[in-house]
Amino acid sequence: MKIGFVCAEYFGFKSIEGKLIPTSTHGGFGFLTKVKAEWLANEGHDVHVFTYAASYNYENNTAEELNENGVTIHLIPEKERVGKSSFSSGIKQLSKLKGNDFFREVLTEQNLQILQFEDTPTTLLLAEVNTIPKILIFQDPFDYYDVNLLVDSQNNYSSLIEGHNEQYVIKREDYKFSSEIAINYLHKKNFVSPIRKLLIPSNNITIFAEADFIGEKVKNLFKLASTPITVRNPIQIYDKTEEKTHKPSFVWVARWDAQKRPDTMLEIASQIPEYDFYLIGTATVSSKDNTSIQTKLETYFSRYPNIHILGFVQEEEKRKYIGKAWALINTSIREGLPITFLEAMAEGTPIISYTDPDRYVSNFGIRVDYSIKSYISAIYKVVEQKLYEKLAGKEREFIMREHEVNTIMNKHLDIYKKILNGETD
């Protein structure tokens, strides 16, 4: 079967002068696409991924083609990119999706049997003239509430934390954002309306959601007749988990931006010097504002010896940090169902989080209020109760049943076959 994936990011690399260089931007969707694509390729399918080249290592106006672990990766030049990481640049470029002939030509010349979209539904516009069957798995769509929440957070990046020190406070003007952009993003022609028009049977699109609550959100946002079926995301589950550190340690894995709130994590860690905190992730390359804020935060919090800012790390190394930690801490103001939650559960690591998608946190960790005090209380509770010992078995059992990669990907294959045989709506 010849299968294509469209994702704005992909967790791939290429060797340049002996150094391993990222081929695209990185994030949960990119990693997820990699897991799916490589599993299918390993099963003998012809798999193609269409993504954007990282701007700092690719400048030519032609698509570059790589092969990694059996997957053909088509890298589209950054100058053709639309829907960049920041809302403002993404909105300005969104109207150009229909005219992105370069991307469409690369996409359609492969004669794919199935084309699957893994991230923002705006990418669906790239294939509106494509007649092949398409699958859209809604991972993390923003509804009106989400956008308003993000506007508030981006306009007050540091003001939501309690008791912050004026020496490192990030001024409001360091992070510019227009609420008008957010309104246009959802209320006008740029998002909801064009996507809604595409989600009709004649366009040969099958819709799924990665979590139950996302299915409900999608139904309401796009006024669908029924709620999309949930197809859980896959995760590799290893036979042996990492041994927890003797001294309590905690891990945070995310982008450095207003949604993920690294400042909150750093403030929490600074108030608990007796435990170690490891922060994995970085600001997106295309966002100078986020990069500047990250630098300010790193400079100030470098004085705390229990805070370890690791930046970007390879997947195997990330898994070890998550596995050894007494808990994964998530400080995001809103989320879909993060891949890091699944990775933590696969390692028997509890989750401390304000967001609670499909009650994963309530069932396998501690759901907190959004305050420094609440997070700190949860951290001490994890240590005092050795919560990982109580939850590890339940987490592993659940994740094996609901997210194990072979089970989920065989479900994908069944879906593909039914679509090609005309057996689904």
Residues covered by each model-derived region:
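Membrane-proximal helix-turn-helix segments that form the acceptor-binding/catalytic region
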Residues: 36, 142, 157-207
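Conserved donor-binding/catalytic core segment of Leloir-type glycosyltransferases
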Residues: 208, 235, 242-260, 266-269, ...
